[in-house]
């Protein structure tokens, strides 16, 4: 996916100005940026398309999974199998080991890690072409983060036609998930050659 001369303005604040968006299929495209740089606003703009930068097919084929894309916490996994209008993916069910989670317990009684796995299972089953992950490992324990990393790597390997954009400030996400690396700096989205370059930039070392 390639968008030229992309700008993002929220209110009177210019977050990105005449930059390029170039995200590769079959890769996890990581975006690092400091607070207030526009990471999450960029994700939302894929759907809102406020600047009319995206074609309608891009907006309609984009899925955002984040802290604000929550599932009803009164439901169980069994409930989702009954009420979700789209087909739930057996592949994702297996990759995330959903069977290890009690399917009769309401989401509000599950751990944060279990909730995140169920969210990924249900929402990724929508089978969208562009998947934006916004801080999805935030506040999760180390074991769950490792399991989600493994899942994402397997998922993109199995679906080379999809684009994954991972917005994160978690250094382990950037270091352990192989992909492309971008930083938001001076209102530009700049590609850097490696995870180490991205991390050094984020830590202010270059």
Give the label of every model feature segment.
Residues 43-86:
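ABC ATPase nucleotide-binding domain signature region
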Residues 142-144:
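Helix N-cap at the start of a conserved alpha-helix in ABC-type nucleotide-binding domains
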């Amino acid at each position: 996916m390639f968008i030229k001369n992309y700008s993002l303005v929220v209110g009177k604040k210019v977050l990105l100005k005449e930059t390029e968006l170039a995200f590769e299929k079959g890769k996890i495209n990581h975006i690092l940026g400091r607070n207030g740089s526009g990471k999450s606003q960029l994700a939302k703009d894929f759907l809102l398309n406020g600047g009319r930068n995206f074609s309608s097919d891009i907006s309609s084929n984009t899925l955002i999974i984040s802290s604000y894309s929550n599932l009803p916490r009164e439901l169980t996994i069994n409930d989702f199998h009954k009420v979700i209008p789209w087909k739930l993916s057996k592949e994702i069910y297996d990759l995330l080991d959903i069977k290890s989670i009690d399917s009769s317990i309401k989401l509000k009684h599950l751990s944060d890690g279990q909730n995140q796995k169920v969210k990924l299972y249900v929402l990724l089953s929508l089978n969208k072409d562009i998947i934006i992950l916004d801080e999805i490992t935030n506040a999760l324990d180390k074991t769950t983060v490792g399991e989600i990393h493994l899942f994402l790597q397997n998922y993109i390997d199995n679906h080379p036609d999809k684009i994954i954009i991972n917005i994160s400030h978690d250094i382990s996400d950037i270091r352990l998930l192989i992909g492309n690396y971008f930083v938001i700096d001076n209102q530009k989205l700049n590609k850097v050659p490696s995870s180490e370059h991205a991390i050094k930039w984020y830590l202010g070392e270059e």
